[in-house]
A protein has these predicted regions:
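Conserved functional hotspots at enzyme active or ligand-binding sites that engage polyanionic ligands
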Residues: 1-117
Length: 117
């Protein structure tokens, strides 16, 4: 069976369950943060997207997304780069949209904060 390419910068609806404790749960939009050329397993590194709250405004690992036709989101959200995780491609449900290059650069900067790079 041929693999479907799921590319860096795509927003996909993903089933994140089961989870434990404070991990973000349920079926929700997530951002693919790894380049498809990296890795040999059918896994994607994902960052969950959650509802925007004012308290997230100055959090360095939260990247704000404004709803737009390109990203397929319906309300203001944030990408939570502190909750990045690998998921099997079978958890990916549907393509919602993409983020732009500037936002992808912000995501990479936030990942550097999270990983201390």
């Amino acid at each position: 069976m041929e693999r479907i390419l799921n590319e860096e910068g795509e927003i996909r609806l993903v089933n994140l369950d089961p989870t434990i404790g404070a991990e973000i749960k349920k079926r929700r939009p997530c951002l693919i943060v790894n380049d498809d050329a990296v890795g040999v397993l059918p896994l994607k590194i994902m960052a969950p997207i959650t509802d925007y709250k004012d308290k997230f405004q100055d959090v360095p690992w939260m990247v704000t997304l404004i709803p737009a036709q390109q990203n397929g989101l319906e309300k203001k959200c944030v990408i939570d780069l502190f909750q990045v995780r690998s998921v099997d491609e079978k958890h990916l449900v549907e393509l919602k949209g993409m983020i732009g290059v500037d936002q992808l650069l912000s995501v990479k900067a936030a990942l550097k904060v999270v990983f201390g790079c």
